[in-house]
Amino acid sequence: NKQYYQNHLVAHSMGILMLGLVTDDDELVQFAIDSPANPRDVKELLSGCILMDGDTPCSREKAGSAPPVKGEIYDRYRHDTGPLKGLQYTHLTLTLLSTTARMCYNNGLDLFAYTAPTGENLRYCFEYYSDFYRSMDSCIKSGYYCGETERMTKAGDNPGMYEMGLRYYPDSEPIRQLINSGTFNRESSYM
């Protein structure tokens, strides 16, 4: 229970969920999604990976960093430890969480509509980070990710993933603005 709320844990839970779905093992699916026996199940990861205003940032972030705001992802600390890989890793975590949510959606559980007891929802992440990929500027908002612009979209953090965000949040203006911005080729972009 000491592992950070980051992409490794999300990939692990996604793998457990996938195995449960493929083998039709309802107990394994429940263990992956919401189980007292699994302290890092999908619902716990949604509340732990998605940051909200006032949340305590990872202890590995530099002192004096901009505080996290609603929709940022815990993996943002990779900006300091990567270094300059905060957007890359937050995109990876959002992709893994969204793929997990999509698997659940396809099996009758809508995690795109799920809001954790402490307020976290995937929509906030799509909306927060969409502005970075629309503007292709890592220095916007708090400036926390400043210095990462040159790396954006070069390490698997493709803005095409936001098509999934638009599918589940069609009324989201920030996501729609990214998709319609012409920043990326919708026909050749992939998740």
Q: Which residues make up each language-model segment?
A:
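Aromatic-lined, polymer-binding surfaces characteristic
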Residues: 1-109
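CBM-like carbohydrate-recognition segments
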Residues: 113-191
